Swiss-Prot record:
Keywords linked to the UniProt accession: Cell inner membrane, Cell membrane, Membrane
Cell location: Cell inner membrane
Annotated organism of origin: Psychrobacter arcticus (strain DSM 17307 / VKM B-2377 / 273-4)
GO cellular component: plasma membrane
The organism's taxonomic lineage, starting at the top: Bacteria, Pseudomonadati, Pseudomonadota, Gammaproteobacteria, Moraxellales
Protein's UniProt name: Putative membrane protein insertion efficiency factor
Length: 124
């Protein structure tokens, strides 16, 4: 049963993603530029599908398309980061002092929005 669901998710992902690419390559150049948000709804849909999967990504995309009308909002609206997938660990004071003494106390942002976006750009 799990294999069946995984296969359906894979084909739905390919179907929705190919529809977005078709829209970007064929339909979007014909229409005048009128998008109210940055990133555009099609780019938002690609990121939402990549980060959240077929079901949640499609819901985010439908909510975004529902907001994209003359009486709706405008401006910068990025895909929310899936922070629930991160695991946070408590570092004790002794451990942090040890890390500082060894020179390991360097903050490197691997979980921020820019890092995730760069990682996704490398995958596509």
């Amino acid at each position: 049963m799990y294999f069946f669901i995984k296969t359906i998710n894979k084909y739905l992902y390919k179907l929705i993603y190919s529809f977005i690419v078709f829209y970007q390559k064929i339909i979007s150049p014909i229409l005048p530029a009128r998008c109210r948000y940055y990133p555009t709804c099609s780019n938002y849909g690609k990121q939402a599908l990549a980060w959240y999967g077929v079901w949640n990504g499609s819901l985010l995309l439908l909510k975004r398309i529902g907001r994209c009308h003359p009486l709706g909002g405008h401006g910068i609206d990025f895909v929310p980061l899936p922070l629930a997938s991160y695991h946070y660990q408590h570092v004790s004071l002794i451990m942090s002092a040890c890390m500082k003494a060894q020179g390991l106390y360097v903050y490197r942002d691997n979980n921020g929005y820019v890092a995730r976006l760069n990682h996704m750009m490398k995958l596509t």
